[in-house]
A protein has these predicted regions:
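Conserved N-terminal ligand/cofactor-binding loop architecture of enzyme catalytic domains
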Residues: 1-45, 49, 66-186, 232-293, ...
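Histidine-anchored nucleotide/phosphate-binding helix
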Residues: 54-77, 331-345
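Conserved nucleotide-sugar donor-interacting segment of glycosyltransferase catalytic cores
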Residues: 188-243
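Donor nucleotide-activated moiety binding/catalytic core segment of transferases
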Residues: 182-197, 350, 360-407
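A donor-sugar binding/catalytic signature common to diverse glycosyltransferases
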Residues: 212-217, 231, 383-431
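Conserved catalytic-core segment of nucleotide-activated headgroup transferases in glycan assembly
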Residues: 280-370
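Short loop/turn segments at strand-loop or loop-helix junctions that form parts
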Residues: 50, 79-82, 232, 311-321, ...
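A short, glycine/small-residue-rich beta-strand->loop->alpha-helix junction that serves as a flexible
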Residues: 50-60, 206, 321-328
Length: 546
């Protein structure tokens, strides 16, 4: 009786704060994903990360049910971060109990228990001992980057978690912030190591393959447990050989060559059309998250000097946004990369320029300005400077770690040097890829002998494979149109996405997606694509240019 009363009270409390879209989504899920009580009580578990990325909940609902069915497992939610105060813990408990977002959405597709990483006294003691051992062994930033615990690599996760949480450009080992962040990362490691020891976990879904979110991933794949990262536009299976999502660019060249000639020709033509749209200044072409174009018409007086010296453009990255998204780079973070280039500016007779992205995050500009003050040979350009203007004024070489300028400047005939072997353009030869720091140094000292001949067809092939061949229309019939309808990329992470998706939902697409996910999971392939969807559904979700 008490449970019935509490359910009614919870419903009354929740009614005014639950969006109509969320309620529609929950009711829809309860209709289409029906599991027996026995299935929800079974011992094996499938872990699904709980977060507020509402568009991803749509994908989670499908993957959770497919994994639960295939493994005969119950779906268990988990949160990434432990509550740091009693107030936070009570707030989270209340939300879970009344089914407030996002917990109501998860409950509707079969998620029962939600695990929070709260450590016991014994676990905290182990984490303290582990911290003392790890911290004493850190002599450099590369030591942090290379950190392994119980043979499992987590250094990159520790590194990027700190940069993001504190919005710092680099790590200072002795700082209270880093000590706190490292302790927290190691506590998460201890918790998830013990959890996987004590529970029969058959699969895990994570939201990110970087930051602390990926600590359960690293421990799981070391034990042979499959891990997935699914969202509205992609679905990846991670293992010991593939620790990062979005890394399929390493096979772009060979996969493009294996396509039928007609598809290759049509793909190159479509890539040409879309690149031209980007270069005309159109915002969001195959980059839904972008809000400004760096290829607008020139709007500044001359920006580069008319000297005979080589003109270098450094395309700065956001310092806090996961430098290790694809793995390790030549430098442990973007700050160290810029500092190296600042030192190189003092050794060379070039005109050095640095530019932030028009969409730079708060704090980035100030850090770049500090570098310009430290290294007077660096000249800071306006963030809204047009790349067309810079090319017209004589930029000779562009430097990036792994940015999109790699293909953009190559398409316009300008050499680009990447400071990473884990960059999205690595399968092709239209950029120069520095192997290590010494190779990078020699390339910069000998720009006149840069070993590069740009084949524009390669640039188009890359663009086709990266942005066209795999459509984003996995769970939506028109992802780009939906983002526009919602009012921008960020709006998909609000409950508004539920209504838009439900208006597009069809039983035929629903069944095709379930079948495709089953095929994908059983295949153990790295990425879900047209191979896993039977025709004609594959033609709708993964269209091939005609």
């Amino acid at each position: 009786m008490f449970n019935n009363v509490w359910q009614k009270v919870a419903a009354l409390l929740r009614a005014p704060i639950s969006s109509l879209g969320l309620r529609r989504f929950e009711e829809h899920n309860r209709r289409v994903f029906v599991r027996s009580p026995a299935e929800t009580r079974c011992h094996p578990e499938v872990l699904i990360e709980v977060n507020n990325m509402h568009s991803a909940h749509i994908a989670y609902s499908y993957l959770a049910n497919v994994l639960g069915e295939l493994h005969g497992a119950r779906v268990v939610g988990y949160v990434v971060q432990a509550n740091r105060s009693r107030k936070e813990a009570f707030k989270a408990w209340t939300k879970r109990t009344i089914g407030y977002a996002p917990y109501g959405a998860y409950r509707s597709f079969g998620t029962g228990q939600v695990v929070t990483p709260v450590l016991t006294r014994a676990q905290k003691a182990r984490a303290r001992r582990l911290f003392a051992h790890v911290y004493d062994g850190i002599a450099s930033k590369t030591d942090i980057e290379a950190m392994r615990v119980s043979g499992i690599w987590i250094g990159d996760l520790v590194y990027d978690a700190y940069l993001r949480e504190y919005a710092r450009p680099t790590i200072i080992k002795a700082s209270v912030e880093f000590v706190t962040s490292l302790r927290h990362s190691l506590e998460l490691f201890v918790f998830w190591q013990d959890y996987l020891d004590a529970h029969d976990v058959r699969a895990i879904n994570v939201s990110h393959t970087v930051y602390g979110n990926a600590i359960p991933l690293r421990i799981a794949v070391a034990r042979g447990i499959p891990v997935y990262q699914v969202n509205l536009t992609h679905c990846y299976r991670l293992d010991a050989e593939h620790l990062f999502a979005y890394g399929d660019f390493t096979t772009f060249r060979e996969r493009f060559a294996a396509l039928p000639e007609a598809v290759r020709d049509a793909g190159l033509a479509e890539a040409q059309r879309r690149i031209e749209r980007r270069f005309r200044g159109e915002v969001g072409v195959d980059m839904a998250y972008s809000t400004k174009s760096a290829f607008r018409a020139p709007s500044h007086p001359r920006l580069l000097s008319e000297s005979p010296r080589k003109k270098i453009l450094i395309a700065a990255h956001c310092f806090f946004d996961s430098p290790h998204s694809y793995g390790n780079n030549l430098f442990p973070d973007f700050y160290e990369w810029l500092d190296f280039l600042g030192q190189m500016s003092e050794r060379t007779d070039y005109d050095w320029h640095i530019k932030t992205h028009p969409d730079f995050l708060p704090g980035s500009k100030e850090i770049v300005e500090a570098f310009v003050s430290k290294y007077p040979k660096l000249t800071m350009l306006p963030s809204d400077a047009s790349h067309h203007q810079l090319i017209a004024e004589g930029i000779d070489v562009v430097l990036t770690v792994y940015g999109t300028v790699g293909f953009e400047y190559a398409a316009l005939g300008v050499p680009v040097i990447n400071a990473s072997m884990n960059n999205p353009h690595i399968a092709f030869d239209f950029n120069v890829h520095a192997r290590d720091v010494e190779h990078y140094r020699q390339l910069l000292l000998q720009l006149d002998a840069l070993p590069l001949v740009i084949d524009r067809q390669e640039v188009l092939a890359y663009y086709f494979m990266a942005f066209i061949h795999h459509s984003p229309n996995l769970f939506l019939s028109d992802y780009d149109g939906t983002i526009h309808c919602l009012g921008g990329y960020a709006k998909q992470f609000t409950p508004a996405i539920y209504d838009v998706w439900l208006d597009q939902w069809t039983l035929e697409q629903h069944e095709a997606l379930l079948a495709a996910l089953v095929t994908f999971v059983e295949s153990e392939d790295y990425r879900m694509d047209e191979r896993h969807l039977p025709p004609p559904a594959a033609a709708d979700v993964f269209p091939i240019p005609a």
